[in-house]
C-alpha cells in the first residue's frame, strides 16, 4: 500500500487514467454534497486557509505498461473524484466562454486534468465512468451537445457549478487556487499484497454513505478476476439492477436483500446488518459458485420487482399486486418470494398462487379492519414457509391461518362483520381501496376511483338543517356521531361539492344525483325517499356481505383441517400459586408485572414450572421468584445490552432458569424503572 497526501492536480497530472469498476454504483452525489464542496472552496479563499481535507481516493494500480497510459481502478472515492472533475469542466467552460478573462488557462485544465493530450480513444480521458455515466461525462469533457431529455446527476451537478462560478463570488483564478488546497490522501494498493475488500470496508467516508446493496455488490464482485467480474456483472448483476427503479434503487434493493435473506434464513435481519448477514449467508449457502448465487438472486429479484412495481402478464395477478401495494404488505414478501418460486418450478399452479395471494391480502385487510396490531406480521410471514407441507401445500397454508389465535388470528366472518359495520372507514388510509373494491367486485366495467370523491350521505356538518334532523329523528346527534364515517353512510360520487349538505331527496333527484348514478354502491339508495339509522344499518349489512366475498376467509373442511389440529396434551397447569411468594416478593412481582404487561396488548404471560415468562413471539424476559427478590433473565446477548447504570450481569454460558445472557435483580419496588429500561430493550428487539 502506498499512501500519499496531495490534491486533485497532483493525482490527475501525468499520463494516467482512473477507471470505475463495473460493480461500482452510479454517480450519486446530489446538490447537498456539491454545496458542501463549494462552500469549502469559498470558505478557504475568503478566510485565507491553507488547506482543507476532503477525504481519500483508494485505487489499485493495473499492470504498468512500458509506454502509454498508467491505469488505476478506483475502489473508493469515485464520487469525490467525479465531482471535482465536474467542477473543473465547469471552470474550463467558463474560461472558454469568457475569453477576456485570462486569469486561468483553459488548455491547462483541458490537457492536464481532463484529458491525456496525446492519447486516442478511451485512453484520452483521465476519468472513465461506467455505463450511461461514461458517455455523459465524455460529452461534457468534449463540449458535445447532450439531449434535453437526458436525466443525470452529472448534468445537474455540472449546472450547479456553472451557476456558482457565474455568480462571480470568487474569481476563476481564486477558484482554481482553492481547488488545489483541497487535500486528498491518494492510496494505491498492490493487488498481489493488499486485501482491497478489507480496506474498502474499513474506510470511513465523509461522502454519501453506501447502501447495504452497494456493499453487497462490491463484496460479490470486487474479489473476482476482471473477466469473471465482467461476466457476472453483465449477465446477472446489471440485469438485476435494471429491474429496480433508478432513483430509489438503493432503498428498494436493500429491502430486497433483507427479504431474500429472511426467506432463506427464516429470521429477519436488522436493516443495518443486511450486508453482514449476507456475507455470513454466502459463506454457508448451498451455492458452489458466485455465478450460481447471483443467478438465484436474479430470479428472486424478478419476483420481487414484479410485486413492488405491479408487473405481470396475468391481469388477475397484476391486480393482486396492486392490492398488496395499496395495503403496504411488504411484510409478506419473504413468504411470497418462496411461493412465486414454487409456482415457477411447478410445485403449485398459477391458480394456487392467485389463491395464496388472495388469502394473504384478506388476512392483512381483515386484521386492519378489526384493528389488530400489525407489529407481529413480519415474523408471522417470515416463519410461514416452515409450515408448508409439500404434499398438502394449499391446505397447510390455509390451516396455518385458520388455527392462529390471539394477536396472530385471521378474523372470522363474525368478527369481520361486526368490525366492518361499525369501523370508521372514512379516516382509514385504505378507504379508497375499500370503496373501489366494493364497487368493482365482479364488475366487467370497473371504475377508476380517482375520478370520484367520497360522499357522506348523511352530511358531516354538525349543525344539520331541519330536513336532516327530521329524517334522522329526535336522537339525530347520536345517529350522526355513531354512523357518520361508517361504511353504511359512505359512497362515491362525481358531484361531491354540488351535493354538500343538501337533503337526501335532493341528492337523489338532482342532476348527477344518486338516481342517475350507474355505480353499484348507489343501487340501494335509488329505492329510497329518505335516509335514517335503519337504512344506514341495512346498507352496511349489504356492503359487509359483499366485503366477506371480496376478502374471503380461507375455505378448508374439518377433514382437511384435522391433521393440523394438535390435540392438547395433558400438561400440568401452573398459576401464581405455583411460586413461593411472600408478602414482600408478591408486591415486587405485582409492580413489575403491571409494567411489563403495559408494554403492549401483544405481550402474553405464561406460568412455567420454574419461572414466569413474558413473550410476544418468543420469551423476551423471564422472572424467577427468590426469597427476598426477583431474579430476571433478559433474552438478549450481553454485548447488545445498553446498561449505563451497570445493573446487569453477564451469564453467557452459565446455566440459569430462563432465557438469555443477561441477568438483573429487583430488590425493591424503587428498582422497577431501572429494571424496565433493560427489559424494554429486549421487548423492542423482538418487535423489530
Language-model-derived ranges and their functions:
Residues 2-268, 511-518, 522-529, 533-536, ...:
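Glycine- and hydrophobic-rich flexible loops that cap the catalytic core of alpha/beta enzyme folds
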Residues 567-592:
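Solvent-exposed, charged helical/coil patches
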Residues 346-349, 640-644, 670-677:
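Short, conserved charged micro-motifs
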Residues 67, 73-80, 176-179, 188-195, ...:
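Secondary-structure capping and boundary motifs in well-ordered enzyme cores
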Residues 43-46, 51-70, 385-525, 529:
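Betabetaalpha-Me/HNH-type nuclease active-site subdomain
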Residues 606-662:
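Short, conserved beta-strand/beta-arch hydrophobic-aromatic motifs that form part
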Residues 654-688:
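Well-ordered alpha/beta subsegment
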